[in-house]
C-alpha cells in the first residue's frame, strides 16, 4: 500500500450532498459517457428508480456489454469503457473494450472492501473506500483509495478524510473533508495540474478535465488551473476554435465539468449552461434558454439532463450523440434527508408526480437556486420539497416579457371573475329549469290520476297492448351481441409517444431498414426498450394498410416463446407503426453476414444449432398449433432475431397468410417472398403450402452451416442450394462448413443437419419433410453436438421450461413402416418420456425422443434412397441413415386442445 502525503492524492465525483450533479471525464453520477475510436456511448440509470442501466450510442462493446439486470448506485466512464458502483456490494463493475480496465470487477480487489465513489480517467479507474470497521475501509483520520489501469494500479492512503475525488486523463484530484482544499497526484508531464494546484483556496466541488481542473469556490465562483494550451500537440491547430479554459465566466455556478480541452457549468441563477475553453470548429453550441439539472462531459462533447418532465438528455459539441431516446434521473438517490440548501426532486409528469427513487427512505436531492434575475422577485423560497420560485414584479416592469406576463395575469384574474359570475348565472338557469320541470311533472301526474277513472274502449286497449309488445321486441333487437367484442393483447400507442421514444425517428436510433419499413430503437416513458417498425409511406395506401393490419392481426393471435412478441401498434393517418420487444443482438443475418467478423466467430456451432432448433420450434407452432395454420412466406436469416440471452425469435409477419385447416391442401397465391429463399414450386405453379416455409428454412440451415448468403454473386455458384446440395450428397461435408469456425471433433451432428437441409430444399413440396419432423431431427443433432447420445441426452441445464408442472407423459408408438433392427432397438430403449407442450416451452434437445411417432410422411421415416447410387463411403452412409432418424414432432391433438381451450 502506498502512503501518499495529503497534497499528493486523488478522488471521485460529488454525490447528492455536494452542489449539483456534474460529471467530468469520468466522475460518478447517474449518467456517464464513454468516448474513443469506436464512437461515443451515453449510459444512464433508468428513471423508474430500478437502478438498472441503459446505454445508447455507437460502441458495440459498451452497448452489448451493459448488464441488463444488475442495479447500480452510480456510473462513470472513460475511453471505451463504463464502470458502475454495484448497489448491493458497493464494488465497481466495468464493461467495454479498454485494454487497461478489464470487464467485470477490477482486480486485484481487497476482500470485503466497499466503496463510496468511483472516478474514471482515460485508461484508469479509482475508487474511494467507504468508512467501515475491520480496518479495510477509510476512517476519520485516514482515507484509502484503490486505483486500477494504466500506470495507476495501487492502493493509496491519505492522512486526512477525503470527501470527493475526480479523475482527469492521466491524473487525479480530490478535496479534503475538513477544509475543502484540493490535492492532486499522477502524471503532470503535459498538464502540470499537480504542481499548479491552489492549496489555499476552498472549493465546494471540482471537476477534472483532460489536462485541467475546474472547481466551484465557496463564493460560487469558478477557478481553473492546468495547461490545456498544450492540446495543439494532440489535435491539429487548424481544427481548434479560440478560447482558453483558464478564462472562466464570472457567473455564479452550482456545478462544473471538464472535457478534454473545455469546461461547462450550470449557472446558479437560472440553471442554464455556460461553456468555455477550446472547441473544434464544427462543434455545436450549448442549448440556449434550456435549464439543466445535471451535466456529464466526454472528450470533445458534453451532455446534460434538461429540467423537463421527459428527462431525455441533450448533447452538444463534437462527435457526441445529439438526441437520446431514453429517460434518466438527474442524480443519484441517497438514503439521507436533503440538507439545508437542497430540495427533494420529484418528476411532475402528465399523469401526476413520479418519484424516481423507489425505496421509501431514499430521495434525490438537488441544490437550491440562488437569487432571481433582474426584474423578478422571489415569490416562494426554496424548501425541502421545491426550489425557489421567481416572478415578475409588475410594479417595476421594464421588459416586454414582464409586461406580457403581467397582462396575462390580469386576464387570468378577469377570467376567474367571469367564471365565478358564469357559475352564478348557470345556477340561476338550473334553478329555473328545475322549477319548470317540477311543475310539468306535477301536472302530468295529476292528469294521469284523472285518466285512470276513464273507461277505455276494447280497441284502445288492444292498440296499447300491441304498442307495448312492439316496444319490448325492438328493445330486444338493440341489445349488443357481447360475443362480437374482442379483447386484443396489443396496446395502442399515440404517434407522439412513439416519436418521443425514438428521438423523432432520428437516424441515430435507426437499427434496421427494409424495402417497406424502417426499424427504430426507442425507450418508452416507463423505461421499456422497444423496437418500433415504421412503414415507409407508399403510393398504394390500400395495400400498405392491408399488410399492416395483416401483421397486427396475426401477432395479436399468436403467442410462442420463439415468435417475436408484439407490444402495441399505432395507426395515425398515413402513419402505421408496430411496437415489438427489442432484440438486443439483432438478426441471424447480421451475425452470419455482417461487417463485424467477431459476431460471426461468437456464433459457435452449439449456438448456431440452438438458434436453428428454436426457429424451427417457432415455425412448427405456426404450422401445427395455430388454428387455422399460418404460412409465413418470408422465412430468412434476417427475419430470425436474437434476444439478449441468444434465444431466436421468428419475426416479420407482413406477408403471412392463414392456411387451410388441412395443411396439405395447396392455396393458389401469387408468389411473394425474398429471392434465394422462395420455393421454386410456389414460384412456378403458384401452389402455396406449409412446405414452402420448409424450403425457406432449409436455405437458412445451409446459411448456418456454410456462413454463405442465400445468393452471393461473388462466388461462381451464387445460389447456395445449387452449390451446397451436390457437395452434401457426395459426402463432402467439410467443403460446405463455415471456414471461420473450427469443425467439431465429431461431425455426426453437422452431417444430420446437412441431410435435413437437403431434404428441405427438394424441388417438389410433397418430397420435403414437415416442420415437426425437421424440429425432431435438429434436436437429435443438437443432442449429439452437446456430447451425449440423443436417446440418453438430458434436458440441458440452460434450458428454460415455462410451466414445467404441465409436463405430459407420451407413450412411444412404433412406426407402421418397416425399420431396421437398430431402429427397433432404439424404439425399445426410448420407452416413456416427458415433454412440455411446445407453445409453452423453449426447445428441449431431447424432445424428439418423447414425441409420438407418425407414419404420415414416409419419405422421412424409414425411407431409403431409390436412385441406385452408392456413394461407398462411411460419410455417405451416415448421411443417408439420417432419413431413418427424423420422426414427427407434434404432440397429440388432445394435448393441444387441453392446453389451448
From Swiss-Prot:
Write down the PROSITE patterns for this protein, in alphabetical order.
PROTEIN_KINASE_ATP, PROTEIN_KINASE_DOM, PROTEIN_KINASE_ST, TNFR_NGFR_2
Q: Where are the bilayer-spanning segments?
A: 424-444
UniProt EC number: 2.7.11.1
Region of interest (7 X 36 AA repeats), ranges: 33-330
Q: Which residues does the annotation flag as glycosylated? A: 151, 179, 282, 383
Q: What class of enzyme is it?
A: transferase
Q: Which reaction does it catalyse?
A: L-seryl-[protein] + ATP = O-phospho-L-seryl-[protein] + ADP + H(+); L-threonyl-[protein] + ATP = O-phospho-L-threonyl-[protein] + ADP + H(+)
Q: Which domain of life is it from?
A: Eukaryota
Listed binding positions for ATP are 511-519, 533
Q: Where is the Protein kinase domain?
A: 505-712
Q: Which family does it belong to?
A: Belongs to the protein kinase superfamily. Ser/Thr protein kinase family.
> How is this protein named in the record?
Putative receptor protein kinase CRINKLY4
**What is the protein's species of origin?**
Zea mays
- Gene this chain is encoded by: CR4
Amino acid at each position: 500500500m502506498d502512503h501518499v502525503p495529503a497534497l499528493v492524492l486523488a478522488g471521485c465525483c460529488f454525490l447528492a450532498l455536494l452542489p449539483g450533479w456534474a460529471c467530468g471525464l469520468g466522475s460518478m453520477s447517474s449518467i456517464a459517457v464513454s468516448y474513443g475510436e469506436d464512437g461515443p456511448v451515453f449510459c444512464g440509470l433508468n428513471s423508474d428508480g430500478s437502478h438498472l442501466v441503459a446505454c445508447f450510442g455507437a460502441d458495440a462493446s459498451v452497448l452489448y456489454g451493459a448488464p441488463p439486470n444488475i442495479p447500480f448506485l452510480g456510473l462513470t466512464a472513460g475511453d471505451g469503457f463504463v464502470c458502475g458502483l454495484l448497489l448491493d456490494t458497493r464494488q465497481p463493475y466495468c464493461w467495454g473494450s479498454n485494454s487497461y480496465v478489464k470487464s467485470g470487477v477490477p482486480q486485484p480487489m481487497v476482500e470485503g472492501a466497499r466503496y463510496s465513489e468511483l472516478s474514471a480517467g482515460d485508461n484508469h479507474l479509482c475508487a474511494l473506500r467507504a468508512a467501515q470497521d475491520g480496518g479495510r475501509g477509510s476512517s476519520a483520520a485516514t482515507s484509502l483509495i484503490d486505483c486500477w489501469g494504466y500506470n495507476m494500479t495501487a492502493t493509496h492512503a491519505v492522512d486526512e478524510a477525503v470527501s470527493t475525488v475526480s479523475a482527469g486523463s492521466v491524473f487525479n484530484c480530490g478535496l479534503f473533508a475538513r477544509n475543502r482544499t484540493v490535492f492532486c497526484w499522477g502524471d503532470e508531464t503535459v498538464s502540470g495540474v499537480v504542481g499548479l494546484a491552489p492549496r489555499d483556496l476552498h472549493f465546494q466541488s471540482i471537476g477534472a478535465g483532460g489536462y485541467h481542473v475546474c472547481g466551484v469556490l465557496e463564493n460560487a465562483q469558478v477557478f481553473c488551473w492546468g495547461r490545456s494550451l498544450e492540446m495543439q500537440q494532440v489535435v491539429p491547430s487548424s481544427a481548434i476554435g479560440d478560447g482558453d479554459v483558464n478564462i472562466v465566466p464570472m457567473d455564479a455556478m452550482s456545478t462544473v465539468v471538464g472535457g478534454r480541452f473545455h469546461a461547462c457549468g450550470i449557472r446558479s441563477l437560472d440553471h442554464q449552461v455556460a461553456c468555455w475553453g477550446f472547441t473544434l470548429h464544427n462543434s455545436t453550441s450549448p442549448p440556449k434558454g434550456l435549464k439543466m439539472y445535471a451535466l456529464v462531459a466526454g472528450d470533445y462533447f458534453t451532455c446534460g439532463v434538461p429540467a423537463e418532465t421527459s428527462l431525455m438528455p441533450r448533447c452538444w459539441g463534437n462527435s457526441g450523440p445529439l438526441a437520446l431516446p431514453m429517460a434518466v434521473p438527474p442524480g443519484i438517490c441517497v438514503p439521507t434527508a436533503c440538507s439545508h440548501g437542497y430540495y427533494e426532486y420529484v418528476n411532475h409528469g402528465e399523469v401526476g408526480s413520479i418519484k424516481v427513487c423507489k425505496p421509501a427512505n431514499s430521495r434525490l436531492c438537488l441544490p437550491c437556486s440562488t437569487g432571481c434575475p433582474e426584474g423578478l422577485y422571489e415569490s416562494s423560497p426554496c424548501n425541502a420539497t421545491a426550489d425557489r420560485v421567481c416572478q415578475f414584479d409588475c410594479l417595476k416592469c421594464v421588459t416586454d416579457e414582464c409586461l406580457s406576463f403581467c397582462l396575462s395575469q390580469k386576464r387570468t384574474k378577469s377570467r376567474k371573475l367571469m367564471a365565478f359570475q358564469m357559475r352564478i348565472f348557470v345556477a340561476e338557469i338550473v334553478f329555473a329549469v328545475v322549477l319548470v320541470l317540477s311543475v310539468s311533472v306535477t301536472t302530468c301526474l295529476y292528469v294521469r290520476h284523472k285518466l285512470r277513472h276513464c273507461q277505455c274502449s276494447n280497441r284502445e286497449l288492444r292498440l296499447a297492448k300491441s304498442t307495448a309488445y312492439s316496444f319490448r321486441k325492438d328493445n330486444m333487437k338493440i341489445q349488443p351481441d357481447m360475443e362480437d367484442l374482442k379483447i386484443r393483447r396489443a396496446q395502442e400507442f399515440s404517434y407522439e409517444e412513439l416519436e418521443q421514444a425514438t428521438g423523432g425517428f432520428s437516424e441515430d436510433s435507426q437499427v434496421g431498414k427494409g424495402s417497406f419499413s424502417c426499424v427504430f430503437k426507442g425507450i418508452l416513458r416507463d423505461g421499456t426498450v422497444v423496437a418500433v417498425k415504421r412503414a415507409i409511406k407508399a403510393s398504394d395506401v390500400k395495400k400498405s394498410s392491408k399488410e399492416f393490419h395483416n401483421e397486427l392481426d396475426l401477432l395479436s393471435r399468436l403467442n410462442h416463446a420463439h415468435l417475436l412478441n408484439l407490444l402495441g401498434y399505432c395507426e395515425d393517418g398515413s402513419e402505421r407503426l408496430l411496437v415489438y420487444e427489442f432484440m438486443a443482438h439483432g438478426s441471424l443475418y447480421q451475425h452470419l453476414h455482417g461487417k463485424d467478423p467477431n459476431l460471426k466467430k461468437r456464433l459457435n456451432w452449439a449456438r448456431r444449432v440452438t438458434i436453428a432448433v428454436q426457429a424451427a420450434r417457432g415455425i412448427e407452432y405456426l404450422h401445427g398449433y395455430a388454428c387455422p395454420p399460418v404460412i409465413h412466406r418470408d422465412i430468412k436469416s434476417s427475419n430470425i432475431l436474437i434476444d439478449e440471452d441468444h434465444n431466436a425469435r421468428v419475426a416479420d409477419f407482413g406477408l403471412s397468410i392463414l392456411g387451410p385447416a388441412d395443411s396439405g391442401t395447396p392455396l393458389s397465391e401469387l408468389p411473394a417472398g425474398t429471392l434465394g429463399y422462395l420455393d421454386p414450386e410456389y414460384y412456378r405453379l403458384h401452389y402455396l403450402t406449409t412446405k414452402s416455409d420448409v424450403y425457406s428454412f432449409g436455405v437458412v440451415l445451409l446459411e448456418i452451416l456454410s456462413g454463405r448468403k442465400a445468393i452471393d454473386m461473388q462466388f461462381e455458384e451464387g445460389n447456395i442450394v445449387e452449390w451446397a446440395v451436390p457437395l452434401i450428397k457426395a459426402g463432402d461435408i467439410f467443403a460446405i462448413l463455415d471456414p471461420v469456425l473450427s469443425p467439431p471433433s465429431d461431425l455426426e451432428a453437422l452431417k444430420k443437419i446437412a441431410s435435413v437441409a437437403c431434404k428441405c430444399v427438394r424441388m417438389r413440396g410433397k418430397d420435403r419433410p414437415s416442420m415437426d419432423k425437421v424440429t425432431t431431427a435438429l434436436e437429435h443433432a443438437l443432442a449429439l453436438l452437446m456430447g451425449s447420445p440423443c436417446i440418453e441426452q438430458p434436458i440441458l441445464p440452460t434450458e428454460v421450461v415455462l410451466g414445467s408442472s404441465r409436463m405430459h407423459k407420451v407413450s412411444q408408438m412404433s412406426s407402421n413402416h418397416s425399420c431396421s433392427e437398430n431402429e427397433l432397438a432404439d424404439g425399445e430403449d426410448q420407452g416413456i418420456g416427458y415433454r412440455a407442450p411446445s407453445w409453452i416451452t423453449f426447445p428441449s434437445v431431447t424432445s424428439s425422443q418423447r414425441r409420438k411417432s407418425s407414419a404420415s410422411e414416409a419419405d422421412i421415416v424409414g425411407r431409403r434412397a431409390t436412385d441406385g447410387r452408392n456413394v461407398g463411403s462411411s460419410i455417405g452412409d451416415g448421411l443417408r441413415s439420417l432419413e431413418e432418424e427424423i420422426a414427427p414432432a407434434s404432440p397429440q391433438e388432445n394435448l393441444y386442445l387441453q392446453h389451448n381451450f
